[in-house]
Regions:
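Structured catalytic core of nucleotide-sugar glycosyltransferases
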Residues: 2-145
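Acceptor/aglycone-binding surface of glycosyltransferases and processive sugar-polymer synthases
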Residues: 73, 84-88, 92-102, 116-199, ...
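Short conserved micro-motifs on helix faces and helix-strand junctions that flank
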Residues: 27, 86-88, 176, 249, ...
Length: 337
């Protein structure tokens, strides 16, 4: 059930949401071909929600095309459009963080800027929020992407669900609505390597999924290369699981056990059977195999140590070089990580 404060947002006469301010956070990187359609559709959706106090926060993540120019022109005719231009390409998650730091609404929706997250789904999120949910996330029931990529996503989410220390919803990305309370907790987290969909789950509060169909890109190509997808997967794994470290200990203990068993067999063959164990080649293979395992898990440990090192430097997650339609306040300054 919605709280009394939330019930004041409803207007029974026209179905619009009154006294409620929604922020929409959108990272943008080289999306000049998509932005005009996105601005039109998102603007219409926010207008349908009423009041006119909503805001669209676009974060230009170091685009080299006309994305920033298009946003600047649009902001002159629509005061709801807020633009942050980062000093360089800091990455998708950092750009979202910049928008979340800027958001002033009672709730915030995070969505991608390629129209794969459909703006028309936002009213459904708002309706669930008004029913009392702090987090409303999109659960993707269909994806219009190559089958191999869909398979990788499918396997990744299920592997993360098994390996993570917290419950991560299956097939849910960054497309979600979060209450002001959840937003403030997220903004207080200083992580440099951010996996926002995992952080959103870690915060807790009342959460619910909404089935949505993930659309195809309106135009252009995905800005998420294989390298960036793998980096995001590693951020999720190493930020929310210590299973790799535990696996190193388990495999190490297993290797020691196998070695001891082989030693006992060798002693038995030598002292009881009066046989000399053969197999120099097999011994070399075994040594090489376990040396490879050792080096692999040394790399895993190094990954954790490297991330700790990144956190200790406390560099900003992002740097804003320009702001449009937003005033500078202490709250707007980038968080140190």
């Amino acid at each position: 059930m919605a709280s009394s404060a939330e019930l004041t947002y409803r207007n029974e006469n026209d179905g619009m949401v009154q006294g409620f301010r929604l922020s929409v956070a959108i990272p943008v990187h080289n999306e000049e071909s998509v932005l005009p359609e996105l601005l039109r559709r998102l603007g219409n959706v926010l207008t349908s929600l009423g009041d006119g106090k909503h805001e669209m926060i676009f974060v230009d993540d170091g685009s080299i095309d006309r994305s920033l120019e298009i946003l600047e022109v649009a902001s002159k005719s629509d005061p709801r459009i807020v633009v942050l231009a980062l000093s360089r390409n800091f990455g998708h998650q950092a750009a979202i963080s910049a928008a979340l730091d800027q958001a002033k609404g009672d709730a915030v929706v995070v969505m991608d800027g390629d129209l794969q997250d459909l703006p028309e789904e936002i009213p459904r999120f708002v309706e669930k929020h008004l029913q009392g949910f702090d987090v409303v996330y999109a659960k993707r029931i269909r994806r219009k992407e190559p089958w191999l990529l869909r398979l990788c996503y499918y396997l990744f989410y299920r592997a993360m669900s098994k390996l993570s220390d917290i419950r991560l919803p299956l097939d849910s990305g960054d497309f979600a609505l979060m209450s002001r309370t959840v937003l403030e907790h997220l903004n207080s987290m200083p992580e440099h390597h951010r996996y926002l969909r995992g952080m959103r789950s870690w915060v807790g509060f009342s959460q619910v999924g909404v089935d949505v169909e993930r659309g195809a890109r309106h135009s252009g190509k995905s800005k998420y290369s294989l390298k960036r997808l793998l980096a995001l997967a590693f951020d999720g794994l190493f930020a929310f699981s210590i299973v790799p470290i535990r696996a190193a200990a388990i495999i190490g203990a297993s290797a020691i056990s196998i070695s001891l068993l082989y030693l006992l067999y060798a002693l038995y063959a030598k002292l009881i059977l009066r046989e000399s164990p053969q197999g120099f080649t097999a011994l070399v293979v075994v040594i090489t195999f376990f040396s490879g395992i050792l080096l692999f898990f040394l790399g895993v440990i190094g990954e954790y140590v490297g991330r700790i090192y990144e956190e200790t430097k406390r560099r900003p997650q992002y740097i804003v070089r320009r702001k449009i339609n937003c005033a500078e306040t202490n709250e707007d300054r980038p968080k140190m990580s």
